[in-house]
């Protein structure tokens, strides 16, 4: 049995590593948040970044959602107390209409992806199936009876089929076996930290329990990741052909993990949604995955310091300016530079603010941004 002093020492080391990484982080970014989402045209693809790993994809009057996080427990709360969905903060910050969302998907089952999902699914997206891996299904077992019969828990991990057709929507989701990057390591702590300690790569909360949970977890470490997945999201036309293809990941990866159809990509990708947080130990990311997918557009997500809860806004406030810290180790400029070096000619990239919307419309030359504010210039 681990002694309390030893546990405290390990926790202190982890917090020190994160703090050291944070101390080297760029200055906070000023974002315009709580921007009302414009109505979605049926013939456009609308992608709304919700913050952390969350987003909404709208197509032909239907929508799917990547698991959002608004509760954002602090490091102190994670270490010293139970953690629970902050319903007040979710209600205040999740302004988008998600009543028509057909599925909420998550690539792994850590708390920063799944903790808020039960409340969102049961009270806001009441027709959405919950799609993920086997660990997600086990951890959310305690709410199964409340979800059924309108909603289901769906695993796309083996031995289950890896493809999910969203009911009543021209949207298909395909899982790709991936892995979770180390949250901490020598490149996060920097050269000074490496002089003081031989810091190993640390991947927190790996694996999964054998049996379904009897209660929803209330400790961060009990939200175990399971087998991490990436997703290919295919938006289909009336004939069932792919009109717009999206790659989504909620953890950085290295080849061949998370690379669809490895080693030869046969498909065109209009948009790749890539995770910035946790990428410090992967020197070839994101260049390798961008070269492999050759997407016309790249969106970087999970860049914020999610240990810092967003402030509660004044009721009804819109267009609120907010200073948001980067997650430890995240360097937006370096990420965008590597993306640009790897993208095909004409490619564009962005690291969006929470509530920012990207709308794509097709013309004779292909899919184009309706409003390109904040996007990089064409490569």
Task: Please describe what each predicted stretch is.
Residues 210-293:
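Active-site-proximal loop/helix segments of hydrolase catalytic cores
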Residues 115-125, 142-143, 311:
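Metal-dependent catalytic neighborhoods of phosphoester/phosphodiester hydrolases
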Residues 22-23:
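C-terminal motif of bacterial Sec signal peptides marking the signal peptidase cleavage site
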Residues 129, 137, 141-172, 291-379:
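Binuclear metal-ion centers of metallo-dependent hydrolases, dominated by the metallo-beta-lactamase
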Residues 66-67, 100-110, 131-133, 246-252, ...:
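Active-site neighborhood of phospho(di)ester-bond hydrolases with catalytic His/Asp-centered motifs
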Residues 32-40, 59-110, 115-122, 182-196, ...:
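Pre-active-site segment of Zn-dependent metallo-hydrolases
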Residues 28-42, 134-230, 234-241, 343-344, ...:
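Metallo-beta-lactamase
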């Amino acid at each position: 049995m681990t002694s309390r002093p030893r546990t405290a020492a390990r926790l202190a080391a982890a917090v020190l590593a994160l703090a050291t990484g944070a101390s080297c982080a760029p200055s906070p970014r000023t974002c315009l948040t709580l921007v009302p989402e414009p109505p979605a045209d049926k013939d456009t693809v609308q992608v709304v970044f919700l913050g952390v790993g969350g987003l909404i994809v709208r197509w032909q009057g239907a929508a799917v959602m990547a698991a959002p996080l608004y509760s954002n427990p602090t490091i102190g709360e994670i270490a010293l107390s139970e953690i629970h969905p902050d319903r007040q903060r979710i209600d205040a910050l999740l302004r988008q209409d998600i009543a028509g969302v057909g599925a909420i998907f998550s690539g792994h089952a850590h708390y920063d992806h799944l903790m808020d999902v039960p409340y969102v699914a049961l009270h806001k997206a009441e027709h959405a199936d919950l799609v993920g891996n086997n660990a997600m299904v086990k951890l959310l077992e305690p709410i199964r009876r409340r979800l059924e019969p309108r909603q289901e828990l769906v695993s796309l991990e083996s031995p289950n089929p890896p493809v999910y057709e969203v009911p009543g929507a021209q949207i298909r989701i395909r899982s790709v076996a991936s892995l979770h990057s180390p949250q901490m390591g020598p490149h996060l702590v920097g050269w000074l930290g490496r002089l003081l300690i031989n810091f190993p790569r640390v991947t927190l909360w790996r694996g999964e329990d054998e049996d379904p949970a009897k209660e929803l977890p209330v400790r961060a470490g009990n939200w175990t990741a399971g087998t991490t997945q990436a997703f290919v999201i295919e938006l289909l036309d009336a004939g069932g052909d792919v009109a717009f293809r999206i790659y989504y990941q909620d953890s950085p990866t290295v080849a061949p993990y998370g690379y669809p159809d490895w080693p030869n990509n046969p498909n065109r990708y209009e948009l790749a949604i890539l995770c910035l947080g946790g990428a410090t130990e992967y020197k070839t990311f994101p260049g390798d995955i961008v070269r492999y997918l050759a997407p016309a557009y790249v969106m970087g997500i999970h860049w914020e310091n999610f240990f810092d809860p967003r402030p509660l806004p004044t009721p009804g406030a819109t267009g609120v300016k907010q200073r948001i810290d980067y997650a430890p180790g995240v360097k937006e400029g370096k990420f965008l530079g590597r993306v640009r070096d790897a993208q095909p000619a004409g490619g564009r990239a962005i690291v969006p603010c929470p509530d920012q919307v990207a709308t794509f419309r097709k013309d004779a030359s292909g899919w184009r941004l309706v409003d390109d504010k904040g996007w990089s210039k064409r490569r």
